[in-house]
Amino acid sequence: MNRAPLKRSRILHMALTGASDPSAEAEANGEKPFLLRALQIALVVSLYWVTSISMVFLNKYLLDSPSLRLDTPIFVTFYQCLVTTLLCKGLSALAACCPGAVDFPSLRLDLRVARSVLPLSVVFIGMITFNNLCLKYVGVAFYNVGRSLTTVFNVLLSYLLLKQTTSFYALLTCGIIIGGFWLGVDQEGAEGTLSWLGTVFGVLASLCVSLNAIYTTKVLPAVDGSIWRLTFYNNVNACILFLPLLLLLGELQALRDFAQLGSAHFWGMMTLGGLFGFAIGYVTGLQIKFTSPLTHNVSGTAKACAQTVLAVLYYEETKSFLWWTSNMMVLGGSSAYTWVRGWEMKKTPEEPSPKDSEKSAMGV
């Protein structure tokens, strides 16, 4: 199916607001029977949930396990980027050998393209590093609350960069999210489990997630619109930029002193973490392809709720009513924002006027 190219301003608008591309939805749905589409969607959503939740728990083990006692969060992140880079290169080579069996773009390291992707790579490094640092210092149960301000930053950046105002109802949902965030911080403090450092890392991770959406749309033309090429260059740049950080923060010395450095179990878990890091990008794309960005947001919110409950049960934690209320406020506010934006998209035309397009381009 031939698809008309999207303007950069429209792509950026979709990235920040969660709008869907009608042609993409039509292509994803096609003419398949309803039951087949429903089964595909159920399988893809389940795969996303299992991959995402497993990755969070595994990263928590690698970053803050009492039995592992490994205090090298930057190295863990670096290794996951290295695994992703090798997987991309391996799949590219496999696709060249078996073009009919494996569908993957050819990858060749071009320094000019790497330089073009560099601004995004810096944001990408911030996103994955702050994510892991947040997870290191806060519990899995509080992790979603600690990183709950992504929607708020999306609204803020939409105004600052796209000059796009947000409706009263959407702002109201953001207020609910912020209220839930502060109530969660208050309750973590009341229970004596609050880590201000982890909370700050969570806020920074939320900011980087929003910035990542902006820079992704700006950089995609440099890699011919290929998400896999962008993933490859992002992770190559990240591996290089992480090396001086490992030296400056003394993590290489800490790694040399690590008691389980020669353990096959340790390296197996590290590699599994890298595999999950690679897989989450793939299953996220699958979920958006078979549903829509808005449905993906709803699925992510529901997954966060299930992840919180699983974390409380797994770690045998006891939480207060107000703590649960803070989680429900964050998850409810996020769901309400998704619903409000979807409702507003249906009321207004998808295509902006030429004047709006010029204003959006100038904002970027």
From Swiss-Prot:
The chain crosses the membrane at residues 34-56, 76-98, 111-130, 140-162, 167-185, 195-214, 227-249, 264-286. GO terms for molecular function: antiporter activity; GDP-fucose transmembrane transporter activity. GO terms for cellular component: Golgi apparatus; Golgi membrane. InterPro entries: Sugar_P_trans_dom, TPT_transporter. It is found in: Golgi apparatus membrane. It catalyses: GMP(out) + GDP-beta-L-fucose(in) = GMP(in) + GDP-beta-L-fucose(out). Pfam families: TPT (PF03151). Keywords: Congenital disorder of glycosylation, Disease variant, Golgi apparatus, Membrane, Sugar transport, Transmembrane, Transmembrane helix, Transport. It is a multi-pass membrane protein. It comes from the Eukaryota. One of its GO terms (biological process) is lipid glycosylation. Belongs to the TPT transporter family. SLC35C subfamily. Antiporter specific for GDP-l-fucose and depending on the concomitant reverse transport of GMP. Involved in GDP-fucose import from the cytoplasm into the Golgi lumen. It is linked to Congenital disorder of glycosylation 2C: A multisystem disorder caused by a defect in glycoprotein biosynthesis and characterized by under-glycosylated serum glycoproteins. Congenital disorders of glycosylation result in a wide variety of clinical features, such as defects in the nervous system development, psychomotor retardation, dysmorphic features, hypotonia, coagulation disorders, and immunodeficiency. The broad spectrum of features reflects the critical role of N-glycoproteins during embryonic development, differentiation, and maintenance of cell functions. PANTHER family: SOLUTE CARRIER FAMILY 35. This is GDP-fucose transporter 1. It comes from Homo sapiens (Human). The gene is SLC35C1.
